[in-house]
Amino acid sequence: MATINQLVRKPRSMKVAKSNVPALDACPQKRGVCTRVYTTTPKKPNSALRKVCRVRLTNGFEVTSYIGGEGHNLQEHSVILIRGGRVKDLPGVRYHTVRGALDCSGVKDRKQGRSKYGVKKPKA
């Protein structure tokens, strides 16, 4: 335990909080260009072909971003918007692609949870 004199000389230092999404530079979203669009398999016990893309961001970072929803139109050189949010069963994937923004289309025939997939309200 430090004495009061020691604390006066050198106060206790605060812990620095480490960001889970360093590539965003404390921004809500970032724009980037797809450099590679591919599928990858999740870790045990899950099994699937998850759609992901490698993105070169405007600040120079190169990150892996998950493409949510059924079907997508992304290819190399597509300009997309990414947000934070990791995918628990894909190691190294800490960002999500924002559907319905820039070159990324919304999910076709989506009726519920539309706002998360960039889909407008259907005509009645």
Curated annotation (Swiss-Prot):
Residues the record lists as 3-methylthioaspartic acid modifications: 89
Pfam family of the protein (one): Ribosom_S12_S23
InterPro entries from the UniProt entry: NA-bd_OB-fold, Ribosomal_uS12, Ribosomal_uS12_bac
Entry keyword Transcription: no
Keywords: Methylation, Ribonucleoprotein, Ribosomal protein, RNA-binding, rRNA-binding, tRNA-binding
Any one annotated GO CC term: small ribosomal subunit
Protein's GO biological process: translation
Keyword Repressor part of the UniProt annotation: no
Molecular function, one GO term: rRNA binding
Domain of life of the organism encoding this protein: Bacteria
NCBIfam families according to UniProt: rpsL_bact
General function of this protein: With S4 and S5 plays an important role in translational accuracy. Interacts with and stabilizes bases of the 16S rRNA that are involved in tRNA selection in the A site and with the mRNA backbone. Located at the interface of the 30S and 50S subunits, it traverses the body of the 30S subunit contacting proteins on the other side and probably holding the rRNA structure together. The combined cluster of proteins S8, S12 and S17 appears to hold together the shoulder and platform of the 30S subunit.
Family statement: Belongs to the universal ribosomal protein uS12 family.
Subunit structure: Part of the 30S ribosomal subunit. Contacts proteins S8 and S17. May interact with IF1 in the 30S initiation complex.
Protein's name in the database: Small ribosomal subunit protein uS12
Chain's gene name: rpsL
